[in-house]
Amino acid sequence: MYIVYVDESGDIGLQNSPSNYFCLSAIIIHESKWDQTLNSIIDFRRFLREKYGFKLREEIHCSHFIHKPAEFQRIAKSMRLRLLRDVIDFQANLSNYQIINVVVNKKNKPIGSDIFNLAWQTLIQRIENTLQYRNFIGSTNIQDTAMLFVDKTDEVKLRNLTRKMRRYNPVPNSFNLGAGYRILPTKLIIEDAIHKDSAHSYFIQLADVNAYFLSQKFQPNQYIKRKGGKNYLDRLQPVLFKQASKKDLLGIVIR
């Protein structure tokens, strides 16, 4: 089984929204590599404590960490950004660790579009397809499944979506099949998504960093642009699951 940790960045609003994009970033790890990966993360958090004075019990929540630091004001802003770059580089060197990114461009969507469902359905479908073709690394099983662990989001809406996809899931035909859709219910995503407070999950905190820099790649704020953080996501290339999209060099699925 694969464990999938997901976090969001941006918002789903189509009117008067500060963001033009809604982003999801998912970390995928096989259960057999989970403990090994967790131990690596704990060692890395100890490194952050020694280098920056960032405690193991403290939460990385990017937008607050950079722009509304509160208790983290003890760490200079430039050093906080460097800490986040270290988080990116740490992940890029992990083995048996992959990331799928989904971005919904809200600028070209008509009023009334369901941005939340579009993003999550796209991500879930990519995970389902990859499980079917056994393209995730870290397993020799004949067939694996996956469970979703997500930061706080619209729990009811996500639950309704995943349950619906198990019964009715229209998927556009590939080019060789012509126009139209096929009904391909998902079978490999186990149970409803489990919602976790990111304060209690190092993995979701990593997904938060990835989702933040995913959104900054498309719509960077002035500070990130000035400091060169717009392309921090590119540093994750060794662990990006680029097969998720052939249309983007980093494999980002853009809708």
Language-model features, listed with the residues they occupy:
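Phosphate-ester processing/binding pockets and catalytic centers
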Residues: 1-255
